[in-house]
Amino acid sequence: MKQTVYTASPESQQIHVWSLNHEGTLTLVQVVDVPGQVQPMVVSPDKRYLYVGVRPEFRVLAYRIAPDDGALTFAAESALPGSPTHISTDHHGRFVFVGSYNAGNVSVTRLQDGLPVELVDVVEGLDGCHSANITPDNRTLWVPALKQDRICLFTLSDDGHLVAQEPAEVNTVEGAGPRHMVFHPNRQYAYCVNELNSSVDVWQLKNPHGEIECVQTLDMMPADFSDTRWAADIHITPDGRHLYACDRTASLITVFSVSEDGSVLSVEGFQPTEVQPRGFNIDNSGKYLIAAGQKSHHIAVYEITGTQGLLTEKGRYAVGQGPMWVVVNAY
């Protein structure tokens, strides 16, 4: 299995393309100059394209991924209705979802042969919209509205329109600020990192009464932390055993173990990392974690070790200015 790591640096308008080997070493393959401040990125389900959101001219760009080394070639672009904060796709590669924090909306762009071709739908009124997350069954889009302490729930129609479900939302505690999400591989639970109080919520997608329920909320900060809380990103290993979340003020990654059924998180430790970690990701083998320091202008590679999933640094690498996003592609 070959793996490629992509890092987005908006201040220098660059994407760095890295080859990741089995020992956790990165080798630079390419530096792409992007026509705009590149921020969120996602790889298409068929692993042939990288979709990126740029500003100040709000667009989604599609890059073809070379099958031999992961290098990028520009392929197409499509306009967006707001500054892109988060980008994702449905599992069949038919639609791109973009959440916009500043515009307070989520948009759906149709893909044709892997390329963005037209805007299909826009839902407004999502104050502080910070991500769009499709459920494993490809039916429901979870959209956190950070400033409203709610996660809105939409059914994805066959033609790409978003239809509010009943109930249309679930709510966090006041002042939590739901931000990014991941789903457990067993499809029974979702985990949401809350930016403003640096906590993680565990959501059961269907409890015994057929309802969505928050079954656990866990503080992700050390007991003696007293500064401003500013959580950012969250990811889970492919086997569902370990979950990680980062805080930018403390410049740390919190390590969680996940119970076998996915319902309970336990804090296992805290890993100091690059300054102001805005984004990170986990490789497809579940062996390595790559974190980006927005203020250090470096990325760090960690090996995920032992039954607790603690992190051991393998190396750090200079990237562009203000790196914010990391994605990994395996082929």
From Swiss-Prot:
HAMAP family: 6P_gluconolactonase. GO terms for molecular function: 6-phosphogluconolactonase activity. PANTHER family: 6-PHOSPHOGLUCONOLACTONASE (PTHR30344:SF1), 6-PHOSPHOGLUCONOLACTONASE-RELATED (PTHR30344). SUPFAM superfamilies: Nitrous oxide reductase, N-terminal domain. It catalyses: 6-phospho-D-glucono-1,5-lactone + H2O = 6-phospho-D-gluconate + H(+). Belongs to the cycloisomerase 2 family. GO terms for biological process: glucose metabolic process; pentose-phosphate shunt, oxidative branch. Pfam families: Lactonase (PF10282). This is 6-phosphogluconolactonase. Pathway: Carbohydrate degradation; pentose phosphate pathway; D-ribulose 5-phosphate from D-glucose 6-phosphate (oxidative stage): step 2/3. It comes from the Bacteria.
